[in-house]
Amino acid sequence: MAKLMENLSLLTGEDGLIYMQYIFEVIQRMHKNTKTDRVRRMIKVGIIGATGYAGQELVRILLGHKYAQIVCYGSRSYIDKKYSDVFGNMFRLADSKCLDDNMEELADAVDVIFTATPQGLCAGLVNEDILNKVKIVDLSADFRIKDVSVYEKWYGITHKSPQFINEAVY
């Protein structure tokens, strides 16, 4: 359970956007605690929902971080299209192809997953196996509201992972 709580770094912010400072702190802390042959390595980042509004902002912020390496631009709408073809302002900055946003596969390939998705998606995908492999920073309200009945009334959907709410960091 302690391992689960350590890896459950779900954070959300007002209106679905997280604070830029927190993003930098997450990457900075992970980088500081990561050594490979006395050399610190880049933190591999995957973004689920990279082509939405919050996802675009997240890409822009992370591209400016010296220790973050975006290895997956997850998008259900633009699979196999270059991120820079979808967003011309990213020409020569983000030329990787958009991939399906499969959280299970992504958890094996990255150090941290950011989810920039509508309410309900992250809660429907996250499970203990994923949380034991990777840190997750969720931009939605899935783990922000601690009272499940308030969440369900406000968003009009059933919360799919209420067991993780008390462990989530907000």
Residue map of PLM features:
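Intrinsic low-complexity/disordered segments
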Residues: 18, 25-28
